[in-house]
Each structure stands twice: as structure tokens, then as C-alpha cells.
A protein has these predicted regions:
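Short, well-formed alpha-helical segments that are part of the catalytic scaffolds
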Residues: 13-30
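Acceptor/aglycone-binding surface of glycosyltransferases and processive sugar-polymer synthases
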Residues: 69-71, 75-85, 97, 103-180, ...
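Cell-envelope/extracellular polymer assembly enzymes that use nucleotide-activated donors
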Residues: 3-5, 39
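Short acidic donor-binding loop at the edge of a beta-strand
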Residues: 90-94
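A conserved acidic beta->alpha catalytic loop
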Residues: 41-53, 102-103
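Short beta-strand/loop segment that forms part of the nucleotide-sugar
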Residues: 32-47, 67-68
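Terminal low-complexity segments of carbohydrate-biosynthetic enzymes
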Residues: 231-295
Length: 295
């Protein structure tokens, strides 16, 4: 029987977390008990919101633990610390990182695991084919996706919602990029031939508006690019040389905008690449204040 850990980072969104846990538990009711041993690890990123008392009886999930962090480190670093904790403290076959807010749909867990059982030596990513956000966010996300392809050569259609075999977890916890960008690190550490995907529809948040602001989307995009900073630097230089050659004799404030944009992007990505700190990552479990057991 496969031992599966669902990894959920959370910051001040306990209502969504418990809604997600209830939906996962109810969804597992129809599963044969011999299919998988599924437990949950929640990484509490030093939430200021008090965790509510749970009144729901979990029947299908085998265990639910909450790691309480001393200091807030951010979403990506919560996942990184969670992967490290699972690797060092748990016997597991697969890890499934999920966002707590409902945008990673628990209804797709079965599809994800079926694919993982079919291809046990591959990472399974949930690639977005449909998003639930408004037009402006969708446009910005599309721009992020194509800029990432153009300047890094990486087509990253997935977020945190993935199914990671043990080999992938071991590779990711030994790479500093995981401390800054989960999806960027996955693309870097696991070869494309060792990855496959399922089609995924982005769910709607259980409660409240999305916390992914325009600024956070830019930071997210640049953090992915920063993982491939050498490729980014080379392609940016090629772009700038080619573009300057094409506009020579027609230089104006308007034609200089793309140059300034690419230079700004490059500098910002290089600054963000300094977040990839292996020493901090290795010591991340020292940030654990306590561990609570919900089940």
C-alpha cells in the first residue's frame, strides 16, 4: 500500500484549510482502504489568525499534523521546509503539495494518483487548461508564461499541485532553488522525460478573494526565471543586441521601452536569485516551534 503525504502550506486561512480537509476526507470515502495510506502535513507559516477548533470527524485520512513555524517565511519556503521535514521524519512513497484555498481541486486527487500508480517512476504535474480568475489576471499570467518560455526555454504550466515520488523529493531538498521557487526547482531538478501531466482546472477560492496580487504574480514569475539565471542572462543579451540592431537609426523613448523592461527584468531576477540560500534551507527545520496533531 502506497504511503502518501499531502503537504499544505497555510497563512491566516484556516477556514479554507478545514474546508479542504473535509472535502479530501469525503472524497476518500468511496476509495478502497487498500488503495493508499493518505495523511496530511500542514505547515503553518506563523499565522496570526488563531486556528479554530475542529468539529469534523475525519474518517478516511489516517493522520493530520500541523507544523507551527516561529517566523513567517512565505509560501514557497513553507513547501520547501515541509518537503524537508517529510523526507527526514516520515516513511513515504509520494508527496502531493496542495494550496489550502481550494484552487487546487481535491476532486482531481484521484486522477493524479491513478496517473502516479500507472507511472510510478515519474513526477505527475497538474497542468492548467482552464483558470478561474478574471481577464486581467489571465492576461498577465499568459504574459508570464510566454516570457518564461522566451527567456529561459522552460514551459512551466503547473504550480504546486503535483505528485512527487521519493526520488524527486530527494533531488529537490538538495537544490537551493527549492527554497525560492517550487515550480522552477522542479523544472530544474527533474528532467522533462521524468515528468508527465494530467489536465487540471483551476478551482475557485473557498473564501475571500485571491491572495495572488499583480505584484506577487510578477515576483512569482521572476523567481522562476531566477532559477535559470544563466540562460536568462544569455537570452537577454541576445535579445538586446538583436533589438538594438533592428532599431538603430530609429531610437526614441518608445523604442527604448523594451530595452528598459528587459534590463529591469534581468536585474530583478538576479536580485531574487539571492533567495536561493542552501544554508537557510538546510536549517529550515530549526524554525519549527511546535507540532500539533489534529488526528
Amino acid at each position: 500500500m502506497s504511503k502518501i503525504k499531502i503537504l499544505i502550506p497555510v497563512y491566516n486561512d484556516w477556514q479554507s484549510v478545514f474546508k479542504l480537509l473535509e472535502n479530501i476526507d469525503r472524497g476518500l470515502d468511496s476509495w478502497s482502504p487498500d488503495v493508499a495510506h493518505i495523511s496530511v502535513l500542514i505547515v503553518n507559516d506563523s499565522s496570526t489568525e488563531e486556528r479554530p477548533i475542529n468539529n469534523f470527524t475525519f474518517n478516511s485520512l489516517k493522520s493530520i499534523q500541523v507544523i507551527n513555524m516561529k517566523e513567517n517565511k512565505g509560501h514557497a519556503r513553507c513547501i520547501a521546509a515541509g518537503l524537508k521535514h517529510i523526507s527526514e521524519n516520515n516513511d513515504f512513497d509520494l508527496v502531493i503539495p496542495m494550496d489550502a484555498d481550494g484552487e487546487d481541486r481535491p476532486e482531481e486527487l484521484g486522477i493524479l494518483l491513478c496517473k502516479a500508480y500507472e507511472l510510478p517512476d515519474k513526477v505527475i504535474t497538474a497542468n492548467r487548461i482552464k483558470r478561474s480568475e478574471g481577464f486581467i489576471f489571465k492576461f498577465c499570467y499568459l504574459a508570464h508564461k510566454y516570457l518564461t518560455i522566451i527567456f529561459t526555454g522552460q514551459s512551466i504550466k503547473y504550480g504546486n499541485y503535483t505528485c512527487l515520488p521519493k526520488f524527486a523529493v530527494n533531488q529537490m531538498i538538495n537544490d537551493s532553488a527549492t527554497w525560492s521557487s517550487f515550480s522552477g526547482s522542479l523544472a530544474k531538478t527533474v528532467r522533462e522525460k521524468d515528468r508527465t501531466s494530467i489536465s487540471s482546472t483551476r478551482g475557485t477560492r473557498y473564501f475571500g478573494p485571491s491572495k495572488m496580487s499583480f505584484i506577487n504574480l510578477i515576483k512569482h514569475s521572476l523567481s522562476i526565471m531566477a532559477v535559470f539565471k544563466t540562460t536568462l542572462l544569455i537570452r537577454s543579451i541576445i535579445f538586446l543586441i538583436t533589438y538594438l540592431f533592428l532599431i538603430i537609426g530609429n531610437i526614441s523613448i518608445i523604442t527604448l521601452i523594451p530595452i528598459l523592461a528587459v534590463i529591469s527584468m534581468l536585474i530583478s531576477a538576479m536580485i531574487l536569485s539571492r533567495r536561493e540560500n542552501m544554508s537557510e534551507f538546510n536549517n529550515s527545520l530549526e524554525n519549527i516551534q511546535s507540532i500539533d496533531k489534529i488526528k
